[in-house]
C-alpha cells in the first residue's frame, strides 16, 4: 500500500498513523500461539503507548485469549472475521505480522506450510513466526523476519517485536525482501513451474 492507502486502511480498521500495529490473522486455536503474542505486547505496553496487537479470525480459543488480554491489560484488539477481500488491506497497513505457531501433542500437531506468512510477505510486511512445521520455511530468519525457536519464549518474542518497531529501515528492508521472496519463490507461477519440473510436465 502507498502511504495514503495505508492511512485509509488503518482508519477503516480503527487505527491511526501513529499506531505501532502488529497483526495476526488466523483461525484461533491454541497451536497458533497468540497467547504468547498477547503476553509479549503486555510486556511492551509501558514503554510503547501506541502499540496494538490486532488479531483477526475466529475459533474455539478466542474466549481464552480475550480473558488473557483482559487479565494482563494487554493492548489487543480482536477484529473477528475479516472479509477475504479486506485481508490485503489489513496485512498492508501492519508494521509486523505475527503468528507464533507451536507444536502440540509431542509434535503430532504441527503447523502446515505457513501461507499467511507468504500473504504478509507479498504485502511487504516483515513477519515473526514460531518454528513449528512449515512456518520456519515460509519465513527466512534475519532476512524476511524472525523465527522464534521456542514459541512460548515471551522475552524473545518481545525482543524481536522491539527490534522491528525501533528500526523503520530494518522493517523496510525486510519488507522488500519479503515481497521479492514471495514473488520469486512462492507465486503460483513459480510453484507450478517447480511441480512441472518435478513431474516432467515441461520436459
Outline where the language-model segments fall.
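Acidic anion/phosphate-binding donor-loop and adjacent secondary structure
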Residues: 1-11
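Acidic donor-binding loop of glycosyltransferase active sites
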Residues: 92-110, 125
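Conserved donor-binding/catalytic core segment of Leloir-type glycosyltransferases
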Residues: 16-32, 38-42
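C-terminal alpha-helical cap of glycosyltransferases
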Residues: 184, 188-203
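Short hydrophobic beta-strand element within catalytic cores of glycosyltransferases
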Residues: 117, 122, 126-129, 139
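A structural motif in glycosyltransferase catalytic domains
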Residues: 22, 37-41, 53, 157, ...
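Nucleotide-activated donor-binding/catalytic signature segment of Leloir-type glycosyltransferases, i.e.
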Residues: 63-88, 96
Amino acid at each position: 500500500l502507498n502511504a495514503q492507502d495505508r492511512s485509509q486502511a488503518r482508519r477503516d480498521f480503527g487505527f491511526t498513523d501513529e499506531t505501532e500495529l502488529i497483526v495476526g490473522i488466523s483461525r484461533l486455536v491454541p497451536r497458533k500461539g497468540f497467547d504468547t503474542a498477547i503476553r509479549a505486547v503486555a510486556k511492551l505496553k509501558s514503554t510503547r503507548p501506541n502499540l496494538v496487537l490486532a488479531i483477526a479470525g475466529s475459533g474455539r480459543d478466542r474466549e481464552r485469549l480475550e480473558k488473557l488480554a483482559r487479565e494482563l491489560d494487554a493492548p489487543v484488539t480482536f477484529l473477528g472475521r475479516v472479509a477475504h477481500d479486506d485481508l490485503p488491506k489489513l496485512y498492508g497497513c501492519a508494521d509486523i505480522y505475527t503468528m507464533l505457531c507451536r507444536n502440540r501433542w509431542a509434535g503430532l500437531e504441527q503447523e502446515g506450510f505457513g501461507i499467511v506468512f507468504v500473504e504478509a510477505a507479498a504485502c511487504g510486511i516483515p513477519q515473526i513466526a514460531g518454528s513449528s512445521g512449515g512456518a520456519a520455511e515460509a519465513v527466512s530468519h534475519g532476512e524476511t523476519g524472525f523465527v522464534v525457536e521456542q514459541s512460548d519464549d515471551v522475552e524473545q518474542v518481545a525482543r524481536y517485536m522491539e527490534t522491528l518497531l525501533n528500526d523503520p529501515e530494518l522493517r523496510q528492508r525486510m519488507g522488500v525482501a519479503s515481497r521479492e521472496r514471495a514473488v520469486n519463490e512462492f507465486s503460483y507461477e513459480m510453484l507450478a513451474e517447480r511441480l512441472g519440473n518435478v513431474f516432467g510436465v515441461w520436459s
